Amino acid sequence: MGQKINPHGFRLGITTDWKSRWYADKQYADYVKEDVAIRRLLSSGLERAGIADVEIERTRDRVRVDIHTARPGIVIGRRGTEADRIRADLEKLTGKQVQLNILEVKNPESQAQLVAQGVAEQLSNRVAFRRAMRKAIQSAMRQPNVKGIRVQCSGRLGGAEMSRSEFYREGRVPLHTLRADIDYGLYEAKTTFGRIGVKVWIYKGDIVGGKRELAAAVPAGADRPRRERPAGSRPRRSGASGTTATGTEAGRAVGSEEPAAAESATTPEAQSTES
């Protein structure tokens, strides 16, 4: 189940929060439709701005929209002209006063939505999909808060006649663990062969009691007690086959010859001592 469902919806109220915060009784359907229109308006007009997330909060007579972007200069525009235009469009759409907050994303390489958008842009520019996926994984794994990432591309990869899905993964991505902080992003690349869907899952550690675990990852088996080797030498293995020195016919023949040679070597000494 955790492999198929959206990680955000799967963990709502546990480790993730709602992206739209408001209460309505009879106007619930209208507000949901309005939220979808707001997100569609922001995503269609600001493709190059690198929008990672859009949060909407409503009061009785005001709508607050928080835009998390990697390039705030594009959203603000010269002397704030672009921000004023966006605010006017949102007020026309909602019919209420809009408070627009533009927030900068500090680490774009650790945001799943921005990583998916970056891979999709490379696919649109005819970059090989395997190279784009590996480059995104390497950039994300350099971030200290990223413990695992999975990137998946689906569609006519490389212009093939039949569509397929391929993914690369590095580190841990526990999709079925509810306390795991999984960031998820989806973006579509428009190519000459059709659309290619890009999905990204990023694991950022576990959240226990509302706090993220900041302890360093302990290597597997580091806390396991070390067993002391008993005194004496182990039988030597011969080659990569894993056989011991006496595990073959030749080894047993050599082993039987060694005691006879030892007896013949010690017999003269014993005779000299007796005499």
UniProtKB/Swiss-Prot annotation:
Alphabetized SMART domains for the sequence: KH
Low complexity compositional bias, start-end: 238-275
InterPro entries: KH_dom (IPR004087), KH_dom-like_a/b (IPR015946), KH_dom_type_2 (IPR004044), KH_sf_prok-type (IPR009019), Ribosomal_S3_C_sf (IPR036419), Ribosomal_uS3_bac-typ (IPR005704), Ribosomal_uS3_C (IPR001351), Ribosomal_uS3_CS (IPR018280)
GO MF terms, alphabetically ordered: mRNA binding; rRNA binding; structural constituent of ribosome
Keyword terms, alphabetized: Ribonucleoprotein, Ribosomal protein, RNA-binding, rRNA-binding
Disordered: region residues: 217-275
A GO biological-process term: translation
Top-level taxon of origin: Bacteria
Keyword Membrane found: no
Biological role stated in the UniProt entry: Binds the lower part of the 30S subunit head. Binds mRNA in the 70S ribosome, positioning it for translation.
HAMAP family xref list: Ribosomal_uS3_B (MF_01309_B)
Subunit structure: Part of the 30S ribosomal subunit. Forms a tight complex with proteins S10 and S14.
Name by which UniProt lists this protein: Small ribosomal subunit protein uS3
Organism: Mycobacterium marinum (strain ATCC BAA-535 / M)
